[in-house]
Amino acid sequence: MEDGTDARAFLAKAAATFTVLSLLPVALSGSAPSHASAALRTISSSDFGAVPIGDVPWPTSLFASFTYEHGVAFGTYAQFAYNATTGALRSLIGLEGRAPVLFLESIDIEGFPPARSAAARGPIFEAAGYLVTITAHDDPTALLEIRSDMARLVTVELPAWSTNISLVSVPGSWRASSVSFVVQGEEARLFLGAGWFNVTGTTVLAHLASPDLLVFKSVPAASKNKAEWRAVLDAISAGHVVSELDLVAIADGRWMQNPGRYRIDVATWPLAVRAGQASIQVDTLRPGGAVVLLAFDPETMPAADPTRLIVRANGNPVNRSNDTLSLFYAPDSLTRDASYSLLPLPGTVIALYLPSLAAVSVEVVSVPQPAPNPAFDPGSEAAVVAALAIVSVAAARMLRRREE
């Protein structure tokens, strides 16, 4: 009898164990409710009423805010003097590095009777003359734009200690000419859209066409990604990067912005910006494609794991490319479709190639990745409890039989 009892107990234990083993895969497998990827939420028409603010309450890694007093524009990243009578700029200084860098001694614009008072609002300083506008940016590159609607001469004096001054001209194309130079070990460039440069020593004569755009931009002195910044300057010089838009979302559906233009006919502006989502418009009257840079602070557009980016152009998904060099240097050879690449620069910086820049609506969304499936969902947990109950009952019966 003892042998028979032990055999029955063993069978009961084996059956219980088999039941547990058969139920555990249910508990541990993919039977938990699936977590579908979050859908791309449409930006409603009510969002388009958001009004960007002008003053930047705190410096960001993308831009800060100018203060303009007594003819001097003071910023976190850039500083210069402005003559309201002649429209001349003096001593453009980059403040990004450990020590200030004097990039430009002076800029004198021919035929510049000031049309209205100069003003600084947020990261933008703007002064207008006769058919010409100066726009300076308080950003790490000390970006400066001079847009002219008539042919004119602009004289730029570089510091006497400038080195590696180099002129590149490609007549008949936009970007027609560029001048690169180094000051105190830091690199900077001048870009001219349709006209040409003459360089004598440290004097640069920019012959602007009608209309034309003269741009200054430097490699941020404190950056750990100088090679990537040089690639950006190369792409601007080649005419492949045509605009930049820096965005930081704040409370109540508002945002701060810093738009930069590298081609005179391309406009890029935000329609709505909030944490994790932005709607942007790109437009031009010229055919052909190019790259636009869209930069966000990490809080506005998280891109690090476990989040991912969704980019759409006119409602169509845009594929991500890891071939940034082709995107910058030969975008047309890479693909005829829109594509984007993430640049290793501060914040979330997207290089977006568009095969056409005419009337393009761009959406960028940061989507949290689904959390890992829990080891036990409610249904699986109930199955495990039932299995353990069976084991307990079988064990109790086995013990009673042994006692008998």
Spans of model-derived segments:
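C-terminal beta-strand-rich structural cap/linker in extracellular carbohydrate-active enzymes
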Residues: 328-370
